[in-house]
Amino acid sequence: GILRQCIHDGFGLTRFGETLSGPEYAQRFIDEAREAGIEASVDTTVIGLDRDRTVTAVSRKGLVQYQADAVILTMGCRERTRGALSIPGERPSGVFTAGVAQAYINLKNKMIGRRAVILGSGDIGMIMARRLTLEGAKVDAVFEILPYASGLPRNIQQCLKDYGIPLYLSHT
């Protein structure tokens, strides 16, 4: 999932006592699951869950059913779309969600532009401001609708202040 494209560190300090990149962090959990004998199904869509905990799914193997003692629903996450954020207009060229920008840069080695502004001061927004700067882009500013930054103080320092990227609060 999303951890593959998070090549920056900052994961795992609480759980593993060291700072890891997204792929390293994910691999730790994969290793733990394998060691515990946990079977995982990827590229699989659950299409039914009965009261008796019979799970019906579709995968490359076809239609499969599992009888479970317990079911843990892990739906994953998705970025909110431009429409969900009430950003008006059509799908303009050069406007990316942070996840899409991160995938282009970190997984596909494609730069999304030479100048950028970031809307939102969450951790991923600040990390992307730094990443774009490291890749040679000019990040003019990070804009935050709230009167305070929503990311961690360390990211304000390491991603914005250290690179001279201004943060404008109460702005959109």
Positions of PLM-derived features:
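Residues forming the flavin
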Residues: G1-T172
